[in-house]
Swiss-Prot record:
It is a multi-pass membrane protein. Keywords: Cell membrane, Membrane, Transmembrane, Transmembrane helix. The keyword Transmembrane helix applies. Disulfide bonds: none annotated. It is found in: Cell membrane. This is Uncharacterized protein MJ0420.
Amino acid sequence: MHICNIIEKIKKIDLFHPVSIVIIGHLMIFILAFPYLDDIGLYSLFKILGVLSIFIVGFFLPFIFPMQIKFNRHILYLSFLLLSFLSIFGAFKITHSLFLSIAYLLFILIIAELFVKFYKKKIFVDILFSIGIIAFLLIVLIYGAIPLFNYEVRMTINSEPLRLISMGALIYAGIENKVYFIIAFMILVLLGYKAGVLMLFIAYIIYRYRNILFKYMVLLAFALLIFLGIMGKIILLSSNQNWDLNPIELLCYRAYFDLYVLSKIVESNILTLGKITLTPNGEHFIGELLFKYPHNITTTLFGTIYLDFGIFGGLFAMLLGVISKYIYEGDKKLYAIYASLLLAYCEIGINYGFLVVLSLLLYINAKLVFAKLLKLINEL
């Protein structure tokens, strides 16, 4: 009877809760990396498990305490300041132009205002869907190739605004209905970035089928992993690199490499003090520091934070937990997108792009709540 009660409680766990997402994401990395774990070594493995446990517990703490994060204007103002700082700082690092940096922030704020005003209208989704398709077509025309089949183009568009616009617009619009989902899925595959495909798929499941049975979720996850493995193999073939690995072995090796990078970070005792997470394309410093060549390298969700701030990065994990709780209790569609982002970054590692999207989602959620309060006041 006791075992049955435990099983029933497990069944009641929300698989799409932020903490569940983070635990499942890291668990999948360890499962996939299992064939190669001997290469990391038992001692190093225990060390990275200890570090990850501290950060995940820190992330979990805000959800343990029975506190309700209620809206007040301070959240709106703080989210605005955070978004403004990250946007202007990042744009200035790239463009070295204060004018362009401010213009970039204004563009983001205009998009946020339009979202708050029209997000319930179908025309808004249709426009975003069209923008996503147009941005993809422009990439193909400008670079003269489909990124999935051309490795050089794929690497070139890593920081291309058109790619980010296309991916963001298609993920948001693609979870609205099946037709948009199928078209968006195909385009994101052709864009050549597995993270975009994963995010669309997970966001669609969370938003449309939140109460899906666990066994079906496992089957869908397995099918998605196989597909992402095949996609990774196609990308590798287009790079002219000779890897004698099948799609599943490729995923396993990629997961192992993420853990290997984390073990190198833990053993390095280097503190980069924000150079990785607060700088656009800061991930290439990981390769420079650990492997002596500048190259964008992924690790686990909190690996970059640990490299920047060491064990004190656990405080950031707690702050991320607080923000995640606020987004989780907010707009369901925005949370579906955030949950998919959180899962994807379990393998990538928190970076500047993640922080910008996080601050944008926080700001939009606060704006939505504020708009509802104003509406209630006006109706009184």
